[in-house]
Amino acid sequence: CCDRIACRFGCVPCCT
């Protein structure tokens, strides 16, 4: 999964 910062740039799924 992607880290929280990567999620902000559209990376999915996000780590929780």
Swiss-Prot record:
Name the predominant localization: secreted
* Tissues expressing the protein: Expressed by the venom duct.
Where in the cell is the protein located? Secreted
Q: Which domain of life is it from?
A: Eukaryota
Indicate yes or no for the key word Secreted. Answer: yes
Tagged with keyword Disulfide bond: yes
Task: List the Gene Ontology MF annotations in alphabetical order.
Answer: toxin activity
Record-annotated disulphide pairs: 1-15, 2-11, 7-14
Q: Which UniProt keywords apply?
A: Disulfide bond, Secreted, Toxin
Q: Which GO terms describe its cellular component?
A: extracellular region
In the record, the note on similarity to other proteins reads: Belongs to the conotoxin M superfamily.
Q: What is known of its domains?
A: The cysteine framework is III (CC-C-C-CC).
Q: What is this protein called?
A: Conotoxin ar3d
What organism is the protein native to? Conus araneosus
